[in-house]
Amino acid sequence: MKTHHLIRVVASLAMLATSGLAYAEEYKASTDEKAIKMTNVASLEARVQAKMEKGAFGYIRGGAEDENNLRSNTESFDKKYIMPRVLQGIELKEIDLSTQLLGIPLKTPIIQAPMAAQGLAHASGELATAKGMAQVGSIFSLSTYGNKTIEEVANVSGKNPFFFQLYMSKNNQFNEFILAQAVKHGAKAIILTVDSPVGGYREEDIKNNFQFPLGFANLEMFAR
């Protein structure tokens, strides 16, 4: 679901609201909360696939078209190596991963990129991710197409900073509304996405006949 669909989506959401229908009645995400034992990301992905609805997992895991870019990105990342620097006189106790981004102090140089529809994976959706990033002292980024509102994310983040990612819409009323919400609830930066003028041709979603079973919280707020 991308920018050019926004007006149609908002109209559909308004119709659903007046008819009393709810996305939550159609899709039941996991509510499990427990420590995860894992050996690597690949093994974790296999376990997740076994527990998730096929279409939802395909959306989260998949990429556009025949996934050439997805594979290229993974292969490129695999070529990044950690170079050991031994005998440099550095003590373990002296190692410090803290840094700053836009003047914001971080405990780690890794932040979380915006990801849509996290409610597909767990009922708490973006709220759980925001809490996790607060615990490790880094930044959570909320997608325009998240399943939780900016206000909800701000409430669980507490004093921990968060960013908001905006898909610029042709509907300027929506742009103004959502940016005002981000400012009101304390987002420290806006991540502007400009490389998605149309939705990706996602072959996995087509094969699975996947349709989003959950509402997009920020769009629903605008439609009210």
Language-model features and meaning:
Residues 2-22:
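Gram-negative bacterial Sec-dependent N-terminal signal peptides
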Residues 26-102, 209-220, 224:
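An N-cap/entry alpha-helix motif that binds or orients negatively charged groups
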Residues 53, 112, 133, 192:
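Conserved, mostly hydrophobic/aromatic
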Residues 96-109, 118-130, 146-159, 198:
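N-terminal active-site wall of soluble small-molecule enzyme domains
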Residues 110-113, 138-142, 162-166, 190:
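Hydrophobic faces of well-ordered beta-strands that scaffold small-molecule active sites
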Residues 111-123, 164-172:
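Active-site mouth loops of central-metabolism enzymes
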Residues 117, 131, 177-224:
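Alpha/beta enzyme core
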Residues 123, 142-160, 169-177, 197-209:
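Active-site-adjacent beta->alpha loops and helix N-cap segments on the catalytic face
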